[in-house]
Every structure is written in C-alpha cells, then in structure tokens.
Amino acid sequence: MTTDKLTSLHITIPDLKGMLPGVETTVSTAFWVPLAQFVLRRSGTFEVVCMREDTGAIKLLMPVAETIERRREDGALMFWGAVTPEVTRAVVGGHGSGHESLWWWQIALTCDGDQVFVLQDYGEHMDLFGLTGDETATVLDLLPFAARTARSMSATGTR
C-alpha cells in the first residue's frame, strides 16, 4: 500500500507587510489572483478578518458572508461562510487588479474540517496545507521570485 506524502508550504513575502491599496510595493502581487483561485477551489468554508480601516474589503464581503462578527479587542470584522462563486469573486478580485486585489488582513480556508490555507498580514505570511507534489509545483510556479528565495517546505513534519 502506498500513500502520497502531503506537503505544507510556509511562504513569507516581507515586502508585502502592511501593504494597503494604493501603496507601491517592490513585489508584484499578480500572483494573488491565480493563487486565490487555486486555494478557494480546494476549500469549502472561509473565514476572513478585516481590520477596521479596511473599508473597501469590508464592503466587498458584507453581501456575501453568511456570518459577520466584530472582534472586541481590536474592532476587526470577522466574516464566515461557505465558499461560493460570489465569495470567490470578492476574495480573488477585490476592487481591481494587481496589489489592489490583495486587501485581506487574514484569511483561513478549510475543507472537510481541515485547514488548507492561511494568509496573514495582507499576504506577508501564507501557509498551504495538504498539497500533493503536483499541487506544490503549481503553487511554487505562481509565486513571485521574492517568495521563491524565502520559502521553506515541510513534508510530514520535517523541515
């Protein structure tokens, strides 16, 4: 009996830290649209956290989220629900293209109760879980060069 080893990718793109719409960055964020499409296809449910000042992102998610809750400690808004075509359009496209579509402070995606994707700090840190070899290669091909030089991979607990 053979089992496929599943891989987790831990991606860091420091130049994206705190990036907000309209702020120039040295890293192209063109990778976001195909990466978001990829991770959302693997997901059943989503959780997105928007900081209070992320009004554009909040307006995008308000009509498509099943549940919305304000976090007491920092006033951030948390959105939950099933991944639907409407959610995919909002998360993938944002209000525009390029860096304007990477508006999300935190994203967690799950499939059948297992976490499959986590994004933090507007994309500075991303984790993908349970990838096959082919899926890993696909994701690595999508990433900007800055992330390729700073990535680490782990398979079944080894780094």
Where are each of the predicted segments found?
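Structured alpha/beta or helical-core interaction and ligand-binding surfaces enriched in interleaved
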Residues: M1-R159
